[in-house]
């Protein structure tokens, strides 16, 4: 039986392969740790990061022990959407990074979806 980490890595690579194969748009990539949430808009054709936002930004969060919650995910989603809008990006592909689409990931995606088309 495979370990949970190996299953997660396989799921992540399968999702990224499907995204890169089917689209020439930039992707909104999500990473979450136990304490923080990160979002990046990446152009794979040029291999550059266009915009990024996370709970490490002082404008987004206040002092707490853990920043990985739905309220902060909404703030990160709004921040990445604002940065994408200022960079002239109107359409992205959502890369959930192997995480289930619920909770923090869903909140971030819904907040970003208000300004960016998925």
UniProtKB/Swiss-Prot annotation:
Q: What does this protein do?
A: This is one of the proteins that bind and probably mediate the attachment of the 5S RNA into the large ribosomal subunit, where it forms part of the central protuberance.
Q: Assembly and partners?
A: Part of the 50S ribosomal subunit; part of the 5S rRNA/L5/L18/L25 subcomplex. Contacts the 5S and 23S rRNAs.
> A Gene Ontology CC term for this entry?
cytosolic large ribosomal subunit
Which UniProt key words apply to this protein? Ribonucleoprotein, Ribosomal protein, RNA-binding, rRNA-binding
Q: What's the protein here called?
A: Large ribosomal subunit protein uL18
Task: Give GO terms: molecular function aspect only.
Answer: 5S rRNA binding; structural constituent of ribosome
Q: Respond yes or no to whether keyword Ribonucleoprotein is given for this record.
A: yes
Any single biological process term in GO: translation
Pfam families for the chain: Ribosomal_L18p
Name the protein family.
Belongs to the universal ribosomal protein uL18 family.
Which organism is this protein's natural source? Rickettsia akari (strain Hartford)
Taxonomy, superkingdom: Bacteria
Keyword RNA-binding among record annotations: yes
């Amino acid at each position: 039986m495979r370990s949970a980490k190996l299953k997660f890595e396989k799921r992540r690579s399968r999702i990224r392969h499907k995204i890169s194969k089917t689209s020439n748009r930039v992707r909104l990539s999500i990473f979450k740790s136990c304490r923080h949430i990160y979002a990046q808009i990446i152009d794979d054709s040029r291999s550059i990061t266009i915009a990024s936002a996370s709970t490490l930004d002082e404008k987004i969060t206040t002092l707490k022990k853990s920043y990985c919650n739905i309220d902060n995910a909404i703030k990160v989603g709004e921040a990445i959407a604002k940065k994408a809008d200022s960079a002239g990006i109107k359409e992205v592909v959502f890369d959930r990074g192997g995480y289930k689409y619920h909770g923090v990931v869903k909140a971030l995606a819904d907040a970003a979806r208000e300004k960016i088309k998925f």
